[in-house]
UniProtKB/Swiss-Prot annotation:
Record text on subunit structure and interactions: The TCR-CD3 complex is composed of a CD3D/CD3E and a CD3G/CD3E heterodimers that preferentially associate with TCRalpha and TCRbeta, respectively, to form TCRalpha/CD3E/CD3G and TCRbeta/CD3G/CD3E trimers. In turn, the hexamer interacts with CD3Z homodimer to form the TCR-CD3 complex. Alternatively, TCRalpha and TCRbeta can be replaced by TCRgamma and TCRdelta. Interacts with coreceptors CD4 and CD8.
Gene: CD3D
Tissue specificity as recorded in UniProt: CD3D is mostly present on T-lymphocytes with its TCR-CD3 partners. Present also in fetal NK-cells.
GO cellular component entries: alpha-beta T cell receptor complex; clathrin-coated endocytic vesicle membrane; cytoplasm; external side of plasma membrane; plasma membrane; T cell receptor complex
Organism of provenance: Homo sapiens (Human)
Compartmental location: Cell membrane
Pathological condition linked to this protein in its record: Immunodeficiency 19, severe combined: An autosomal recessive form of severe combined immunodeficiency characterized by onset in early infancy of recurrent bacterial, viral, and fungal infections. Patients usually have chronic diarrhea, recurrent respiratory infections, and failure to thrive. Immunologic work-up shows a T-cell negative, B-cell positive, NK-cell positive phenotype.
Name under which the protein is recorded: T-cell surface glycoprotein CD3 delta chain
SMART domains found in the cross-reference section: ITAM (SM00077)
Role this protein plays: Part of the TCR-CD3 complex present on T-lymphocyte cell surface that plays an essential role in adaptive immune response. When antigen presenting cells (APCs) activate T-cell receptor (TCR), TCR-mediated signals are transmitted across the cell membrane by the CD3 chains CD3D, CD3E, CD3G and CD3Z. All CD3 chains contain immunoreceptor tyrosine-based activation motifs (ITAMs) in their cytoplasmic domain. Upon TCR engagement, these motifs become phosphorylated by Src family protein tyrosine kinases LCK and FYN, resulting in the activation of downstream signaling pathways.
Residues with the Phosphotyrosine modification: Y149, Y160
Domain of life assignment: Eukaryota
One Gene Ontology molecular-function label: transmembrane signaling receptor activity
Signal peptide: 1-21
């Protein structure tokens, strides 16, 4: 039991040491993205951005250009010796479709219409086979029984009756 409490305390201490002591605000003005700090901003990785006249504000560029990166603020008035980092990741989908109720209804209606047209095409194609006669024509083309089978002679004592020529049948 002591090992589990020690392990949970160790995990908690590790997680708390990674928590930022202060927040770094991200602003969106019109179509641009800005990172604000009380003191100074340091670029770590990603979009470099442009420092404005005061070094407390970093312009990351237009939202539509997907700004992303990691930035560090070097302390605030309260936390002078602390550093805090923020990760910015914008994903502007330029070729996406907004799925409002009208768009979803349009997709469903066009899907039903396309399915019905496909079913109609299959029905028309499968319903009219070319080169095949109807069922009535099949029965007329059959041969009569007399022409296909040879009649057996009167029953003999042999195990099987002998097949002979076209003898007259006894009816």
């Amino acid at each position: 039991m002591e090992h589990s409490t020690f392990l949970s305390g160790l995990v908690l201490a590790t997680l708390l040491s990674q928590v930022s002591p202060f927040k770094i605000p991200i602003e969106e003005l019109e179509d641009r993205v800005f990172v604000n700090c009380n003191t100074s901003i340091t670029w770590v990785e990603g979009t470099v951005g442009t420092l404005l006249s005061d070094i407390t504000r970093l312009d990351l560029g237009k939202r539509i250009l997907d700004p992303r990166g990691i930035y560090r603020c070097n302390g605030t008035d309260i936390y002078k010796d602390k550093e805090s980092t923020v990760q910015v990741h914008y994903r502007m989908c330029q070729s996406c479709v907004e799925l409002d109720p009208a768009t979803v209804a349009g997709i469903i209606v066009t899907d039903v219409i396309a399915t019905l047209l496909l079913a109609l095409g299959v029905f028309c194609f499968a319903g009219h086979e070319t080169g095949r006669l109807s069922g009535a024509a099949d029965t007329q083309a059959l041969l009569r029984n007399d022409q296909v089978y040879q009649p057996l002679r009167d029953r003999d004592d042999a195990q099987y009756s002998h097949l002979g020529g076209n003898w007259a049948r006894n009816k």
